[in-house]
Amino acid sequence: MSCRKFNAPRHGSLQFCPRKRSKTIRPAAGAFPADDRSQPVHLTGFMAYKAGMTHVVRTKTQVAKNKQLSREIMDAVTVLEAPPMVVYGIVGYEKTVTGLRRLPIVTAAYVSDGVLRRMFGNRYASKESAGQFCKGSVCESRVEMIKERAHCVRVLVQTQPTLIKGLGLKKAHIAEIQVNGGSISEKVEWALGRLEKEIAIGEVFGVNENIDTIGVTKGKGFQGTVKRFGVRKQPRKSRKGIRKVACIGAWHPSRVMYSIARAGQMGFHRRTEKNKRVYMIGNGSSNIKTEFDLTEKPISPMGGFPHYGEVRNDFIMVKGAVVGARKRVVTLRKSLLRQRAGEELVIKFVDTSSKIGHGRFQTSAEKKAFYGARKADIAAEIH
């Protein structure tokens, strides 16, 4: 024990206390970007489903004193499938001395079954009464109230999980997303014109833009202190356990402090990650190619993403990892920080090899050209 240090930094961050399970699997955005009324009316968020990860090769340009250098960098990226969202309601908030207060909601004439399932479950009576949210003069009076008294306007949107076969979801995920830009009346008219209509992810975000991701991490269950906080294991000769904290506090105060590493829930926490760079926005049904890699191929790897499948709808590619398991809903939001002029984004290569093993080929045609014709293919041609 001669080399033992008697002082060390604490293990585990106290930033995310308490470490408990999230209330919902789709956490709402707690804040939205500041409203700039000089800009055109636009939406500030979107919902997508995590598909999986791959990697890309891009060119980075560095400017030195007398020369300009460029080198290739490989980045890990996350692909999220984002089918178009549907607007089914409008809500306004007025400013009071105690904060924002919600005004009456204006809903569309038709609300899909996915929204009713999410709001009322399978209770038939509730769904019948919910089909008459507001109609006629009631809606008109509520719209006028929002125009006169609202400080900010948000729209009620729903996802379309039935477009993704691998999810097996009937309940749509619903959320409130703020509308920024323009005056209050312009925002209300913009929202009224998009009731019961789809909004694509390309209308909200752009390539080379920084966004925030809000989601729930993978759940790990009840774990000990070594895995949960990363504390050091005790020596082999220790009594009454090795994977535990040796001293949990002083004699007085005669209680265990909250800052002591203890066993408990790990994972399934709500987390917000800021300034994720958007690398690509496209559609899974169309092929992609770059200026350097002219091979046309789908965004899905060979065999599909493990435990997810193939991406067939709109998708967004984000640099780095995104919290949560595959098939989990993630809320994307425009960055709260001021956008800075970033470097030019030049993607040279997108990897689409199989993620099930050590993939060698980018497309099935490339694999067939390498191995040649199979017996099954020859037999199929004969018959």
From Swiss-Prot:
GO molecular function term, any single one: structural constituent of ribosome
GO cellular component: cytosolic large ribosomal subunit
Ranges that cross the membrane: none
Record's subcellular location: Cytoplasm
Keywords of this entry: Cytoplasm, Ribonucleoprotein, Ribosomal protein
Record Gene3D superfamilies: 3.30.1430.10, Ribosomal protein L3, domain 3 (4.10.960.10), Translation factors (2.40.30.10)
GO BP terms, alphabetized: translation
Chief location of this protein within or outside the cell: cytoplasm
Database matches in InterPro entries: L3_arc_euk, Ribosomal_L3_dom_3_arc_sf, Ribosomal_uL3, Ribosomal_uL3_CS, Transl_B-barrel_sf
Signal peptide extent: none
Family: Belongs to the universal ribosomal protein uL3 family.
The name this protein goes by in its record: Large ribosomal subunit protein uL3
Native source organism of the sequence: Encephalitozoon cuniculi (strain GB-M1)
Gene name of this polypeptide: RPL3-1
